[in-house]
């Protein structure tokens, strides 16, 4: 009887932990969807923050300023900085991004942060 209670407790624990792991993975996946990585390029030039993918939704109200990526990047990009300091890459040719640019001020570069 004691072994069956232990086994049931173990299976309940595994089920709870498994569901938590799935939830965490789903949250991280959702975060990557809205905040694609910004990768710092170069060894000598420390001012080149580049975008390799773009966020699909740009909520302008969340951002306080922006700056363009450097000319040494493969893809052009606009990096928006949120109130929390999060960096979000956006496509500069997107109409929604252009609207955001008209309402926000251009700010300083990111300070050489590496976001992966």
Curated annotation (Swiss-Prot):
<dbReference type="GO" id="GO:0008009">
    <property type="term" value="F:chemokine activity"/>
</dbReference>
<protein>
    <recommendedName>
        <fullName>C-C motif chemokine 6</fullName>
    </recommendedName>
</protein>
<dbReference type="InterPro" id="IPR036048">
    <property type="entry name" value="Interleukin_8-like_sf"/>
</dbReference>
<keyword id="KW-0202">Cytokine</keyword>
<keyword id="KW-1015">Disulfide bond</keyword>
<keyword id="KW-0964">Secreted</keyword>
<dbReference type="InterPro" id="IPR000827">
    <property type="entry name" value="Chemokine_CC_CS"/>
</dbReference>
<feature type="disulfide bond">
    <location>
        <begin position="51"/>
        <end position="89"/>
    </location>
</feature>
<feature type="disulfide bond">
    <location>
        <begin position="50"/>
        <end position="73"/>
    </location>
</feature>
<dbReference type="InterPro" id="IPR001811">
    <property type="entry name" value="Chemokine_IL8-like_dom"/>
</dbReference>
<dbReference type="GO" id="GO:0005615">
    <property type="term" value="C:extracellular space"/>
</dbReference>
<comment type="similarity">
    <text>Belongs to the intercrine beta (chemokine CC) family.</text>
</comment>
<dbReference type="Pfam" id="PF00048">
    <property type="entry name" value="IL8"/>
</dbReference>
<feature type="signal peptide">
    <location>
        <begin position="1"/>
        <end position="21"/>
    </location>
</feature>
<comment type="function">
    <text>Chemotactic factor that attracts mostly macrophage, but it can also attract B cells, CD4(+) lymphocytes and eosinophils.</text>
</comment>
<keyword id="KW-0145">Chemotaxis</keyword>
<dbReference type="InterPro" id="IPR039809">
    <property type="entry name" value="Chemokine_b/g/d"/>
</dbReference>
<keyword id="KW-0732">Signal</keyword>
<dbReference type="GO" id="GO:0006955">
    <property type="term" value="P:immune response"/>
</dbReference>
<feature type="disulfide bond">
    <location>
        <begin position="60"/>
        <end position="100"/>
    </location>
</feature>
């Amino acid at each position: 009887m004691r072994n069956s209670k232990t086994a049931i407790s173990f299976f309940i624990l595994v089920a709870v932990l498994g569901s938590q792991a799935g939830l965490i993975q789903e949250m991280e996946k959702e975060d990557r969807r809205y905040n694609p990585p910004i990768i710092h390029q170069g060894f000598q030039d420390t001012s080149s923050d580049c975008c390799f993918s773009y966020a699909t939704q740009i909520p302008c109200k969340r951002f306080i300023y922006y700056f363009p990526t450097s000319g040494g990047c493969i893809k052009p990009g606009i990096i928006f900085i949120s109130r929390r300091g999060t960096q979000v890459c956006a496509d500069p040719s997107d109409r929604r991004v252009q609207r955001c640019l008209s309402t926000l001020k251009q700010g300083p570069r990111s300070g050489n942060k590496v976001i992966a």
